């Protein structure tokens, strides 16, 4: 992915509602009202002291010139005492200005970092209250970007733009007032330089922008080509495409070179052009100032002060343009943060939740209807009773609604109609955390985090002892392979857990479910990622584990669920058949067709 653009072609991200976002941001800053007021006062003071400095310093220049004149005419000399006092006054002003600027920056840094700290905490807490629907609708990268990039962009944008906006506006107005006080005619000449510079800069920006856009496109293309070639290096080599791939890369690289050269060349023209125009303005001002000084309208020191102000006049204008970009970027980031914080949350738990400490495992589905989009239900009218301790297998083609039923049972989603009961109580009567503690679960997608194998298994029950963790690993047939790894149970898994095989990941997640020792067990494709021998070992362990527990087994490979007490066959969101393995085969219905088709595939 291409990086951010620099130079005149940079196009900042803009918020959809700038005013509304800034209003929310100020509301967030309400608790820091007094420190913010102090920051603004210090910023104004620092700028004001900096503005009056050149005017006071000009009196020293005037005194020096006057003293030289007196000395040459024999009427006196230079009053160094007076000049020294003036210089000390200016030094004191600049020192106070620097102190004000230091404390203003220190206080503002504290405010912005406290705000960032608070927002990260609020986003993290919000994530745990968000419905599963949100995470299935949005990418993981987008959610992570809110808590890292957007919060950082927002806080750094505030630190850079808030005081700069105040100081630069104050500087612009203050410098203009001081220039007018010295000479309105010289000020007029100085102001004429601005539109000339603006016109020339605008023409350069307009011409260079298309090259910056082309540069970014070509940069994205070259990054994509490198990533594609790197990811598919084996395929490139296998088909002897190294030469062709290099030619394609060279063509993109050449386009990037041409567009980058033109954009950087035109961008580089801005500085010499604006410098030339501003220097031309200096020449005109000095010429006019010398004429006015000769007539006694102004002093030599006034000319020196005016040139100083003239140099400072264009700086805040340039910085205000940059601040505008920073504010847009900051507001866009803040808008994304606030949009996330304003997202609808899961319905609150009941005020008096049902006790869940001694759940037996009786589960009932009563006319359940559900759809990820309510207008398109995937579960139509599902009813089923599962007594405690029974093993129920749920089978059916992809999209039949098998995994959806598990999500509803654990309240990752709530039903659109009907109800699900656990031990005779509607699952919505339990607090979500209490309900989910009653489930041990092994999902299709194995999830392990960075840490030791011991820590990953213990995630199922944080208070478990090492001996209990090892016992769970043995029950899941994971102990043998763990002991062959470097470090054994203390081996560190990396962030993606790529230093163990997919089958080993599956065994570790099963060990975690064993350790949880919950009354209800959910196995979603639990043996889909292991070899036949490992699957047999796991199946034996699961048969032992499921005794005395209500177990829901979801599997496409029907050979793994022959021993289930009941098999529910789902099709298009409905239960079309139910019974034991032998009963369903004897009926010769949809289940028998599924089973026979898999058997034929194995034989073939």
Regions found by a protein language model. Give the residues of each.
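Short intracellular "coupling" helices and adjacent cytoplasmic loop segments at the cytosolic face
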Residues: 2-13, 113, 121-145, 149-151, ...
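Juxtamembrane loop-to-helix connectors within ABC transporter transmembrane domains
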Residues: 20-21, 29, 108, 128-172, ...
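Alpha-helical segments in transporter systems
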Residues: 26, 34-59, 90, 105-109, ...
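An intracellular "coupling" helix at the cytosolic face of ABC transporter transmembrane type-1 domains
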Residues: 31, 132-133, 151-158, 162, ...
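Transmembrane helices of ABC transporter permease
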Residues: 31, 35-48, 59, 160-214, ...
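Transmembrane helix-loop-helix hairpins at lipid-water interfaces of multipass membrane proteins
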Residues: 36-100, 180-185, 283, 294-300
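Helix-loop-helix
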Residues: 67, 178-192, 262-335, 340-341
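ABC-type nucleotide-binding domain
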Residues: 349-350, 356-604
